[in-house]
Amino acid sequence: MVLARVYYELFSHEAEWLDAHSGADAELGRQLRLEMTDGSRVFIAWAWGADGDGYHVEFAPHSFCAGAPEVDRDVSAWPLWSPLVGQPVTLSYVGEGQQVLAIRAAGAAAYCCSFGRGVWGMDELRVGDRPPQHDREPARGT
């Protein structure tokens, strides 16, 4: 899969924040859309498990949202995404529980997380250049 374009599908209030903070990490209430050079699409969003539990990051070839986004923002040229555009990308989960999804290509990476800034972020997908540190019990000896 060669990445052609990256879109943030947004609510209007999210677009206003992004206009003032372009290139920054983002927290999306809707979803992220990757478009490939072959015309295929990959949608990434926060999701609940089949039984209504198991909050996690999920990706699929179909939208997770009903209806069109209020704002469809092309972020392909942003510093987070530009190293990945035009490259074959892989998507893989980091760690357990499908909480962090890495999108990697040619030594660059973007991360989609169900938590950010050290706390769980229900109903949001955090997108950034590194996975956040999740609150965990300290390692022994610390």
Ranges and model annotations:
Residues M1-T142:
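Surface-exposed, interaction-prone regions used to assemble/regulate multi-protein complexes
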